[in-house]
Amino acid sequence: MLTCSRLEPSARARHGHTAKGKYYLVLATNIWYHYIGELMEFNGVIIEDTYAEGFPVWAARVIITAVTKEWAYKAATEATGFATSTIGCPCEAGIEKFIPASETPDNRPGYSILICCGKKALKEQVLERVSECVLTAPTTAVFNGHAGEEEIIPIKLHFFGDKFEKKVEVGGIQCWSIPIMGGDFIVEEEIGAIKGVAGGNFLILGDSQMSALIAAEAAVDAIAEVDGVITPFPGGVVSSGSKVGSLNYKFMGASTNEKFCPSIREAVIEKGLETEIPEGVKAVYEIVIDGVSEEAVKAAMKAGVQAACRVPGVVKITAGNYGGNLGPFKFNLKDCI
């Protein structure tokens, strides 16, 4: 049960903000939030009244199974490598979730991965990642992870069998069995693709590198419990946020985002440039989220933001956007609390 009470004047003074309307304190499972004018706080962490800007992508979900959970994970990890951002990678990809043997077509443990990019590039990426990273991994099999897909990606791996391949049925699914050195590779050759959403994000500002990092890890762990999303960067965390272009090097398409670099806060101010680093902030980490739908990304952002705010030392949560020029999806931080 939620209980609400008006904040006392001393509480307002403690937070250093003038009155712009009603002040409320809401208590719920030891987590509290309140609104101060346009400022929001959750569990004592400032939540900036801004939004992340998402854009449409095509997403393929591939289920990878193996004789053990460990081998399925190794194959899934390989298949999602070099896929953090389409700024410099051919796609964005990550492990979505573990799937127990009772829920896979061949009754073996597995993982689902999401591969996200443009429609044309997606066909190439699914084929290349399955053929080079999963086919080559011991005991693996591949199945389509999308039901009711909008597009079909034919990966045609059976030709690798050089006419020694054969059609088989696995769990009621038509597949190919390709003979390989380690036995037989089972693959469902038609992988579905749907219209997904990329670009969900939020930034965690901490009073130390470790507080920000622990909060980022907590956020990623919480997001991992949400179906239909991935956090494509290493460990789900972005350490080197970038801006479009460069202030000093014309040949650079992207460069460090000095607004969010704590170590040069004073230098940025001295140059007359803007900084987004409040006093006392020592580190910033960003969480980027891609998903199969707008709803999935919203749920992931909410789970991640709230988890991050539960970590001591987190000062502020904000998000990155391009003023509506990047994409049609708006993920407001106020909806995360």
Model-derived regions, located:
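Glycine-rich phosphate/pyrophosphate-binding loop regions near the starts of catalytic domains
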Residues: 102-111
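Short hydrophobic alpha-helical segments enriched in small aliphatic residues
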Residues: 11, 16-18
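Conserved mixed alpha/beta catalytic, RNA-binding, or beta-rich assembly cores of soluble enzyme
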Residues: 40-49, 53-98, 113, 117-120, ...
